[in-house]
Amino acid sequence: MMISRGLFGWSPPHIQPLTPVSEVSEPPESPSPYLDPGAEHGGTGTAAQADDEEEMEEPEEMEPPPAAVPFSQLFACADRFDWVLMVFGSVAAAAHGTALIVYLHYFAKIVQVLAFPTDSDHLISDDQFNRLLELSLTIVYIAGGVFISGWIEVSCWILTGERQTAVIRSKYVQVLLNQDMSFFDTYGNNGDIVSQVLSDVLLIQSALSEKVGNYIHNMATFISGLIIGFVNCWEIALITLATGPFIVAAGGISNIFLHRLAENIQDAYAEAASIAEQAVSYVRTLYAFTNETLAKYSYATSLQATLRYGILISLVQGLGLGFTYGLAICSCAMQLWIGRFFVIHHRANGGEIITALFAVILSGLGLNQAATNFYSFDQGRIAAYRLFEMISRSSSGTNQEGIILSAVQGNIEFRNVYFSYLSRPEIPILSGFYLTVPAKKAVALVGRNGSGKSSIIPLMERFYDPTLGEVLLDGENIKNLKLEWLRSQIGLVTQEPALLSLSIRENIAYGRDATLDQIEEAAKKAHAHTFISSLEKGYETQVGKTGLTLTEEQKIKLSIARAVLLDPTILLLDEVTGGLDFEAERVVQEALDLLMLGRSTIIIARRLSLIRNADYIAVMEEGQLLEMGTHDELINLGNLYAELLKCEEATKLPRRMPVRNYNDSAAFQAERDSSAGRGFQEPSSPKMAKSPSLQRGHNVFRSQELCFNSEESPNDHSPAPEKLGENGSSLDVGEKEPTIKRQDSFEMRLPELPKIDIQCPQRQKSNGSDPESPISPLLISDPQNERSHSQTFSRPLGHSDDTSASVKVAKDGQHKEPPSFWRLAQLSFPEWLYAVLGSIGAAIFGSFNPLLAYVIALVVTTYYTSKGSHLREEVDKWCLIIACMGIVTVVANFLQHFYFGIMGEKMTERVRRMMFSAMLRNEVGWYDEEENSPDTLSMRLANDATFVRAAFSNRLSIFIQDSFAVIVAILIGLLLGWRLALVALATLPVLTLSAIAQKLWLAGFSKGIQEMHRKASLVLEDAVRNIYTVVAFCAGNKVMELYRLQLQRILRQSFFHGMAIGFAFGFSQFLLFACNALLLWYTALSVDRRYMKLSTALTEYMVFSFATFALVEPFGLAPYILKRRRSLASVFEIIDRVPTIEPDDTSALSPPNVYGSIELKNIDFCYPTRPEVLVLSNFSLKVNGGQTVAVVGVSGSGKSTIISLIERYYDPVAGQVLLDGRDLKSYNLRWLRSHMGLIQQEPIIFSTTIRENIIYARHNASEAEMKEAARIANAHHFISSLPHGYDTHIGMRGVELTQGQKQRIAIARVVLKNAPILLIDEASSSIESESSRVVQEALDTLIMGNKTTILIAHRVAMMRHVDNIVVLNGGKIVEEGTHDCLAGKNGLYVRLMQPHFGKNLRRHQLI
């Protein structure tokens, strides 16, 4: 019967712990750069901070409740049709809610048939038979009413909810796009505000549609249940009400603890989530420093913090559910026991007692379910307050009705302007600023960081208004001008152009109507037409967040085309070419030069070399105009501009290279001859000196300059190979020179972790150094521990490529099918004892469902078939049995939920560790795939592991419980009457469909179209992220048009969606009642045909009615399990994936010595995500040990790819990358990367202390070594100036550092690593000139450290200490040689470096 869940199916909300029990050993000796040091009080700096925080603690004040609108205000956007829908929906919900109570009323009449007189010749009289048929037909009528009311209820509330929230969304977006820029400065324009709006609207929609209907439905059940209960037997109803608070208290107390524990466990897992997110986000850095084991340990250790919470949740859940069910069953036994007094004294019959009892129980459950909606109502009211407050907010105070100038000359004047941002009013940006821009002239604004130059463009665009002063256009204050007209006269091009998720055509024409011919003409002027035409869909190619990814150069060209199409009088350029390489910068500058002709132009520049041709240069300092004039005039003045230019030029002009200081040439010749005797030539680099000191002197040997073109190569020989053992050690027993001083293996000191088996050879240590050396001993080899020039290695064996190929064939081939049940069971096998104990509890509790129904049915039949003392004895016996079952239920629930909970927690933890460990074994190419983005992987770690738990431990618990319920119910049915049992079983498929449909409905009305809302929100998110572009090009109406179009599609879809969901839900409820009517009809038929007695038949009918949900639920779980099986498949695809580049091959080589010779031989390469684009083609490059080679080239020529191949982030498609004559594939991957130091263009800083960021390279480094590394990196001074020094927390939760400071910390990390091979990837390209100089000095010192160095550069500053320069174009070497040689060729190298040297490039010689 449908009331069975009313007695046994309700429980406090089930809260699944996010993080499980961990089984990790002792922590490492050194702190992890992933873990928050605030969590451990071992550091003095951290402890001091903690003490300060304790002193600052004040008594907590209770926060006032958040503001909320009145409930009626939720429907403020409803029109007349919405009110009609809500009225019909409410009536239908009330009718649907009373249906179960009405059925219960007729159930009493079914039981009352037992009181009819029977025919002596028949087991059932004609009156009884006809009455049962009549009642079964009545239940069919109820089923029809439920079908109609359920359909109308769901459909009406879905439709009205979508309609009302569509109006709210539209009004909100309209107001949002009309806000001034100070609003976005305050609340952010990074898309978070859109996500908040989307979630707020969903809360409102849930509150005013789904939850209102659900509330009316359950309140109707509550009211009708009380009425029916008191009408049938008010005494029983009253007593049942009196016991209700005790049952509610048991569940409520456990809920309070569960919610608190849930919050604690969320906070505990946040630390682990942060570790995982940083690890997968910065995986290249993590791999480069071979810290995979540390990351795994840190992640596992952070999961340890959730151990006690997981156990407590399982404990509280088991006890809470046990006492709730136990008290409910004992209460039922008491009501039935009291009922016998009313039956004996003829004050009520059995049907009235059972109806009163269950009607009040259902009434209480209805009230409980109705009360759960109040939380949603409160959330909806709070969300509505936030949205309605925004909707009622006045739009931008700017003038929309101003004047329009008849003709625009373009004279611009800033007159005594004072300005500060509203979000930071205490910080003055401009203070008495004056500036005049003559018509059709270009004025460049320069100055130090924080001088205020970047605020000029938003003031000119009227994103903001000055605090004091005025901005004039042709003598008219721009406040008096019509805003839309003003912005139509201004073209804006920025360094980071905004592209929206539209086609290229729509992006160029953004905010205005234009023909395709006009768009193409604008693209041609912007030098964009060629690359657009080469795309498959041309101008219809989708770009932006959801479309094709374009290069920065291409984005800027589209931005220029957009400005060209606007044909503005005034042009604003904000550091347009700052992030481009030389060739891209030249092309873009040509397009800008054309665009600037005949227009008043303001240029914001940070690189002074780009603005020498401006008509005037204005120099700003602290918000004021310091000086203004032409380039030559300002140079002659010799003030700030000259100083800034001098700083920039200092980073460009090549310096003399450091060379060895020999007392006489004979000494050098002797060493050269000695070297030749060992089978190799002296490398061209003068830094290959074996002297521990690199001193400058007067007697300098300068090697002959070499120059090669694309068809030539240096005449260098590879070092002679030597014979090696299988482990990479030399078979030569002669004298061996020790290796460079290296770090001790931190991994060797970590406790053993399950599924983490990483072995690392113990490396030798050395502490010798020359105190006389001007170069730190951290940068050079130990004099007693030099790299051996003679101990080199032969090429790899031929079969290594075959092995790699076989791995690639197997790539991602596992688990196309979901994992088997046995695979899941294997994961939980260590907790088999917990599973056994939990299964015992689940089996006992599941069996009690039909057993309790059977005993209650016996009590009810006893009311009719027994009298006097026999009735009293029988009822007492059965009620005592029910009470005992209630007590056993407490124990059974505790066993079930506590032990299955522990098993699930351990399984979740184990799967998370296995997934994280497997992720960190994959090659970098795996992370490049879209489905393996950091956000996605972090989310999968958080959620997918819980799916494994849900699919096994949770579902196993319910499956065992319901399976025993089914088995016991079938056994009871077969014992009482097998024919009726078979009919009941035949209805199971139909009831299964009903259960599935109902579960889908209970999951929420709105989920079916949430994806459409997400797509609609992308339009708004694009606009908010690029709000400056939207406002500057007056495209708010365009955004509004696109958004409304999406809303119209959603409304059309929601109508059909609502009707379909409503029909499915109504029909599912119809099937539930119709099957019950069928069962009652066959019960009457069975008795009439003398298959069984009437009392026995009705007992079996009641058993199956009570057990209906238990019989159906295992099948109802099918869609959930099938859905989760897809998630499970993805989990095991990660765990079982075989990486194409194996990091843990213990049979690979780990030689004791490294020479440092690197060769890329006949390389063909394309990225796995772009196999159609060949990045390197038949590429060859050789770098001798100790040499420094610079690689330059246009954007996309393959420069950074070289470093990725050397770090073995990727393997080439064809060819070989060799280290000391052996293919990189023959080396152990972690060993290989441990001998390389990598400095990237974007410095990666972990969210921890500066100390831990530096010692990330070598965890056993001493304090002195760490500080020495910081000094070499020019970082010690600024670190020491911070309040907490090296213990300062940086990153997401700490102090914000500049890009230059971050880069210096990254350099210090590489210095501390002291690897023999150094890889630098445009380390100073993204840093402003002033900071770039400091970073450049640190790089210079690092490069002088006697290492094999490959640097990617696009500034001449990086060419100071190079032995060879390689120029790339199209994945091939087109020029090669020294700086002077390449400068003399006047080829691509000259064109690339022209912006940095000017016309006199050839004069600069490397001396």
Swiss-Prot record:
The chain crosses the membrane at residues 84-104, 139-159, 212-231, 236-258, 310-330, 351-371, 840-860, 880-900, 958-978, 982-1002, 1061-1081, 1102-1122. Gene3D superfamilies: ABC transporter type 1, transmembrane domain (1.20.1560.10), P-loop containing nucleotide triphosphate hydrolases (3.40.50.300). Residues 86-379, 835-1123 form the ABC transmembrane type-1 domain. InterPro entries: AAA+_ATPase, ABC1_TM_dom, ABC1_TM_sf, ABC_transporter-like_ATP-bd, P-loop_NTPase, Type_1_exporter. Disruption phenotype: The abcb6 abcb20 double mutant has compact rosettes that tend to twist laterally and bow, with increased leaf down curling and wrinkling, twisted inflorescence stems, twisted siliques, and lateral organ separation defects, and reduced internode lengths, as well as fewer secondary inflorescences. In abcb6 abcb20 double mutant, roots are short and twisted. All torsion phenotypes are associated with reduced auxin levels and reversed by auxin efflux inhibition with 1-naphthylphthalamic acid (NPA). Expressed in aerial tissues. ATP 1 binds at residues 447-454. Its main location: membrane. Pfam families: ABC_membrane, ABC_tran. PANTHER family: ABC TRANSPORTER B FAMILY, ABC TRANSPORTER B FAMILY MEMBER 20-RELATED. This is ABC transporter B family member 6.
